[in-house]
């Protein structure tokens, strides 16, 4: 939050700022109020800087939620964490260091209110993660001082990891999946795009999408016959069917790390959403995986590619990372810098605003 003021000095004129856990939701809301998305005009051509907020619960923190949508009783914190973490922790000190679990039902209620208040807000960052391990010890608290990367010195974000050693404990995927599905359903209800974090879980994310496949022509015709619909085929393919699908309209696979072959699955016409793929130098070009990222970027359709900094601090470093990834994508795609920048801008506008 301390680096937000550095946005006013950045070359970037629009930032998409995403929540990840309980402490972030209000911070993102405050930032969106400081730099409101313009209304009454095309936001993509606004003359002033603005923030597109995104509200969601990241899989790294999904253990902090308990699913009470079908029950009222709040679980015992220790028993809750033993049931959602693998292996089940026996370390009492570690268990006591974890925050009291938060109601998924309440989180969804509050998130819907925020999404309603901010009509251009996204759902994110959400997703699935097989590899993440919880850090040791208590999380950073408000008032602890941090030197922000590329931004101003200020407080740690409450609840953050901030370089602590990792434990052997992971969040059970059987717990992560209903948390993700619930947020997908909320995004579908309000027709909002979603940013998805997926690490070693692209197949599981795809399975979730596949569980809500677009109906085939035969299925649409059968539905129309059953309901005695006399509208044209075009009408049957339109808003009524779209609204009946419990799925978001657009999904971005954030800092996509999957193989090129998986793109065909995500881009299949049966997937009930327009899938975009974003890339960052911080994630996609920071290791030996760079060669894979190059082959993936070459294979992504020109109108489905996005770029990002994947940095938590506004300021010069964020500008630098954004510039680097624009140059990298243009080089790989063999676009001129000017043409590539315009393509990426159009893609972002289409993803965010539809």
Question: PLM ranges: what are they?
Answer:
Residues 1-55, 66, 116-244, 251, ...:
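An N-terminally biased module of ancient metal coordination in phosphate/nucleic-acid-related enzymes
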Residues 13, 245-250, 267-278, 301-304:
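Glycine-enriched alpha-helix->loop->beta-strand junction motifs that scaffold or abut catalytic
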Residues 29, 205-209, 263-267, 289-294, ...:
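Histidine/acidic-residue-rich catalytic or RNA/ligand-binding cores of hydrolases
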Residues 74-87, 143-155:
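Fungal intrinsically disordered, low-complexity polar regions
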Residues 94-110:
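Glycine-rich anion/phosphate-binding loops
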Residues 231, 237-241, 259-269, 286-299:
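Short loop-to-alpha-helix "cap/lid" segments that border enzyme active sites
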Residues 303-319:
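Short acidic/histidine-rich active-site segments
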Residues 320-354:
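Mid-to-C-terminal alpha-helical segments outside catalytic/metal-binding sites
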């Amino acid at each position: 939050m301390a680096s937000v003021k550095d946005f006013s000095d950045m070359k970037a004129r629009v930032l998409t700022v995403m929540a990840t856990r309980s402490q972030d939701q209000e911070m993102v809301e405050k930032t969106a109020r400081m730099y409101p998305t313009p209304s009454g005009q095309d936001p993509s051509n606004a003359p002033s800087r603005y923030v597109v907020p995104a509200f969601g619960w990241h899989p790294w923190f999904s253990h902090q939620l308990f699913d009470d949508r079908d029950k009222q009783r709040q679980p015992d914190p220790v028993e809750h964490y033993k049931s959602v973490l693998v292996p089940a922790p026996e370390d009492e000190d570690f268990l006591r260091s974890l925050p009291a679990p938060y109601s998924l039902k309440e989180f969804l209620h509050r998130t819907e209110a925020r999404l309603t208040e901010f009509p251009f807000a996204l759902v994110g960052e959400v997703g699935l993660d097989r590899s993440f391990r919880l850090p040791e010890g208590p999380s950073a608290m408000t008032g602890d001082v941090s030197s922000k990367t590329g931004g101003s010195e200020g407080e740690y974000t409450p609840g953050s990891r901030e370089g602590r050693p990792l434990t052997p404990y992971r969040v059970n995927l059987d717990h992560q999946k209903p948390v993700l599905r619930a947020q997908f359903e909320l995004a579908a209800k309000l027709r909002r795009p979603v940013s998805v974090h997926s690490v070693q879980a692209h197949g599981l994310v795809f399975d979730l999408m596949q569980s809500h496949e677009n109906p085939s022509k035969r299925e649409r015709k059968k539905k129309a016959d059953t309901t005695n619909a006399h509208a044209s085929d075009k009408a049957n393919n339109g808003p009524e069917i779209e609204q009946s699908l419990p799925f978001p309209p657009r999904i971005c696979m954030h800092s996509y790390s999957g193989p090129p072959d998986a793109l065909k699955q995500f881009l299949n016409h049966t997937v009930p959403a327009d899938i975009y793929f974003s890339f960052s130098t911080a994630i996609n070009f920071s290791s030996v995986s760079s060669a894979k990222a190059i082959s993936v970027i070459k294979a992504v359709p020109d109108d489905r590619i996005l770029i990002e900094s994947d940095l938590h601090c506004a300021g010069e470093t964020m500008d630098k990372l954004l510039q680097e990834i624009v140059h990298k994508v243009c080089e790989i795609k063999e676009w001129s810098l000017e043409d590539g920048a315009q393509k990426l801008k159009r893609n972002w506008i289409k993803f965010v605003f539809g």
